């Protein structure tokens, strides 16, 4: 998300819900809202100080993003897993009907691909050549109940999307922000060639923090003060250039 908002997407100065003549981003796995809100604030959509209200009573920053409070940068209520593909595809179709040279981006968790609605949209997008669409899969093999392969193994995602007719890009170093920028630029340059694009981004949950790496147990758990200090010391600022 950092790379998309700071380096890739064409964005208008003022936020509007319809996003006319600009690129759009939709977050499907809405439970990663802290990351989304942080990026939006640092991209000028609302004051950074508002991040301190996260999940508090009457805050605009709830656990799952919602349009109810009119938070700039949020266009859909997300977190009902599996709906993001359908929303992004619909927005991409709208851009094409309006003859805009704009791209729709979306982010999805690998676990939510277990929802059948995804695959109806994936099939539709390829069959109808929705080629102004770039979808990224956060492929970390973790979901709330455990490892993806143990809960419901999705097999080889590259082969699946290829079979459905998508242009498939793979990134092994999904935690390397420079590599992320390269693959997103590659995807952007491949748009408008009669195929939707998917990036299978292999990542590690909790990367850089020794007690959070490689486990699903931090999926919905907040660190205490001691754990927070330790995590911040192990994982210092890495995006200052963005």
Model-derived features with residue positions:
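Glycine/aspartate-rich loop-and-adjacent alpha/beta segment that forms the canonical ThDP
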Residues: 177, 181-242
